[in-house]
Every structure is written in C-alpha cells, then in structure tokens.
Amino acid sequence: LVSIDYDDLEFVPEGVKIFIKRSKTDQSGEGMTKALPYFEKKEFCPVTFLKKWLEISKIKSGPIFNISDKSVALLIKKYTSLAGFDSQKYSGHSLRSGFATVSAEFGVDERTIMSMTGHKTSQMVRRYIQEANLFKNNALNKIKI
C-alpha cells in the first residue's frame, strides 16, 4: 500500500491491476500483479474509491498514497477504535489474516487465497486461516441428533 506508484496501476473493465514491486512474501523483488475487481455495491468498492482518490488528489505520477507503514498502522488503530472495536487487536497483519479467514469461510479455495496473499505454500496460508471454522467444519454437525 505504501509503495504503490501511479504507474503501478492499470485500470481495466473488470477493475484495477496493481503491480506490487516488493512485498513481505516477495523479498527478491520479482514483483507480482494483483487484481481488485469492481464490487457490486459501489459504497464498498475499493476500485471506485481509488479512482475517486486519484481524481480528487490530482495524482498523475509517483506514490498514490504519501504515507508510511507506521502511519497505516496508526490509521488501522484509529478507525477500528472509532468503529467500536478493541484497536489493540488489529494491525495490518491481523487484517491479512482476517482476509484469509473470511475467504475460507466463504468457500474460497486455498490456492485462490494464496494468489492474493502471496503465500508460497498451503501450510503458510493455513496458519492465517484461523480457528473460525472450528464449528463450521465440525464433524459433529453431520450427526443429526
């Protein structure tokens, strides 16, 4: 997020492609392209908001967000608190983990989750898929008593 430049974006009919030059899961700096599709509900659509941000900010080159990783962490704390959550429980890492967990709950297969999170092995992404499925995927649910 903090290292995305305007030239890393490619808007296409389906949404936006973002070239990530380097990330925690790509230490060698090979880079990877991620896609954000348009959401049905515009009020939740990150592509719509990104376009609006670029329009308002008049950014045409360089960083799309002039922000540091520490500032992102502070924003996460601020807005989780404003939303009524315990901000101490939230970070960039917990949001990534939450994405993997919610995706799994909605039936997204591990490979697809891995393509978004950048994990190289199923074992690593499984660490992110938290215990949320303990009841959903419980064998006792199959026993009708």
Residue ranges and their predicted role:
Residues T117-K142:
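Catalytic-site neighborhood detector that most strongly recognizes the C-terminal catalytic loop/helix
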Residues V2-F44, K52:
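Conserved tyrosine-mediated DNA breakage-rejoining catalytic core shared by Y-recombinases
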Residues I56-G62, A73-S115, S122:
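Short, basic (Lys/Arg/His-rich) helix/loop patches that form interaction surfaces
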Residues E10, T25, I59, S81, ...:
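Residue-level marker of structural boundaries
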Residues G31-S81:
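Major-groove DNA-contacting interfaces characterized by cationic-aromatic clusters
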Residues L1, I20, L50, I76, ...:
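Mobile genetic element proteins and their domesticated derivatives, centered on retroelements
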Residues G29, T112, N137-N138:
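Intrinsically disordered, low-complexity regions enriched in proline, serine, glycine
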